[in-house]
């Protein structure tokens, strides 16, 4: 299997393009990838030349979720620290002070769906698939998924996804408000959309996003709501990770 830098970062015309880059494993989230994704977001935020961020996946998948071997590791050890490390990258996208776009080129599954949901806007490629899949694996949702999905599509569609296993292809994602549009080349479309903040004064872009966060739900910032959801989900997800049911489903998935 080829070796890759797990996260790539390039900057052009005031836009940072961040690519999760493990195509042989469908960009599954590992501790290393998660940490490098946070570092890439922080580099973009700290670069005065960057006005917006686009996140995408290398190869055919956007992000196939958490690395199953990482999820199943450390049997008997507390699961919470492992889960928090896997959350770290998409939480950095969620808290990014710059406008963010997820160019969803393929499957966004589990934690990969969280990565897409963490962005301000999602653009779907023709092969995009949005699939929570937590329940199918015997897992409780985590990383603020319950809050992010309800924010994006409302409570009924979010419950259809998380409780009933509903998935969304590119067209249905747009129909339900999960994605802004379908584009043959979602990265190109995302870069074109990002030309808006790229042409604006950076301080205005930063202030506009900060104000939208504050006014989305008066009385609290959306970041605070995401953190609360993450904390509420962490215990039940950790319990489910350590359950015999998850172990059996993990073993079955690894032997397919």
From Swiss-Prot:
InterPro entries reported for this sequence: ClpP/crotonase-like_dom_sf, Enoyl-CoA_hyd/isom_CS, Enoyl-CoA_hydra/iso
Catalyses which reaction(s): a (3S)-3-hydroxyacyl-CoA = a (2E)-enoyl-CoA + H2O; a 4-saturated-(3S)-3-hydroxyacyl-CoA = a (3E)-enoyl-CoA + H2O
Gene3D superfamilies, alphabetized: 2-enoyl-CoA Hydratase, Chain A, domain 1
An MF annotation (GO) of this entry: enoyl-CoA hydratase activity
Keywords: Fatty acid metabolism, Lipid metabolism, Lyase
Inducing factors: Induced in response to the thiol oxidant diamide.
Region entry Disordered, spans: 235-256
GO biological process: fatty acid metabolic process
Keyword Lyase: yes
Known EC number: 4.2.1.17
The keyword Nucleotide-binding is annotated on this UniProt entry: no
Family: Belongs to the enoyl-CoA hydratase/isomerase family.
Function, as annotated: Could possibly oxidize fatty acids using specific components.
NCBIfam families in the cross-refs: PRK05870.1
Protein's name according to its UniProt entry: Probable enoyl-CoA hydratase echA14
Gene designation per UniProt: echA14
């Amino acid at each position: 299997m080829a070796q890759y830098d797990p996260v790539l970062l390039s900057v052009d015309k005031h836009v940072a393009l961040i690519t999760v880059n493990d195509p042989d494993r469908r960009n599954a989230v590992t501790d290393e990838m998660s940490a490098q994704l946070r570092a890439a977001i922080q580099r973009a935020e700290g670069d005065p030349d960057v006005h917006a961020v686009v996140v995408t996946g290398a190869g055919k998948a956007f992000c196939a979720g958490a690395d199953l071997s990482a999820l199943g590791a450390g049997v008997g050890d507390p699961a919470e620290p492992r889960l928090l490390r896997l959350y770290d990258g998409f939480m950095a996208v969620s808290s990014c002070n710059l406008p963010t776009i997820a160019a969803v080129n393929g499957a966004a599954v589990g934690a990969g769906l969280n990565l897409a949901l963490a962005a301000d806007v999602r653009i779907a490629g023709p092969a995009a698939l949005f699939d929570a899949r937590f329940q199918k694996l015997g897992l409780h949702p985590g990383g603020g998924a319950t809050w992010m999905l309800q924010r994006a599509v409302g409570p009924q569609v979010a419950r259809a996804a998380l409780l009933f296993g509903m998935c969304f292809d590119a067209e249905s994602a747009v129909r339900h408000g999960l994605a802004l549009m379908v584009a043959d080349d979602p990265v190109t479309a995302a870069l074109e959309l990002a030309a808006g903040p790229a042409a604006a004064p950076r301080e205005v872009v930063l202030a506009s996003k900060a104000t939208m966060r504050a006014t989305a739900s008066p009385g609290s910032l959306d970041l605070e709501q995401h953190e609360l959801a993450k904390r509420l989900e962490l215990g039940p997800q950790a319990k489910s990770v350590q359950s015999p049911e998850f172990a059996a489903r993990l073993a079955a998935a690894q032997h397919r």
